[in-house]
Amino acid sequence: MVEFRTTDQLQAGLAEVERSPIDDGTLELIVQRPATDEREVLDEAALSATEGLVGDSWNQRGSSRTDDGGPHPDMQLNIINSRFLALIAGDPERMALAGDQLVVDLSLGSADLPPWSLLRIGDSVIEVTDQPHTGCAKFTKRFGLDAFHFL
């Protein structure tokens, strides 16, 4: 059985998360979601302006943030800080469960990476949008309510 981190444990690990680099981060993990609740860890991937992470199912997922309930074009890629994810996941094998396609060792705070910033990942340049990526019910189930509130 998985033990979720408590708020106190998360607070204790926050200093390490805050040591994330502001520039010159590292791509630590690429996770493709070929279908709902499926994960495939990749060594490399292609990014596309129309598809996001090629082979990912983001374009089959509806959004409450669009008028028609369809996929949100500003939410093709989800990025999470690797230090934060390691803190909440505990076991490295659980990191792919987060649902974020790109796991980076980089400060992702809005002060360091505000909306419309450009971020180079390999040969690709992505634009940070103004769409927040907050946890969902699946995130809470996988990592606990304290981790959800800690986002």
State the predicted function of each range.
Residues 1-151:
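Metal-cofactor-dependent catalytic cores
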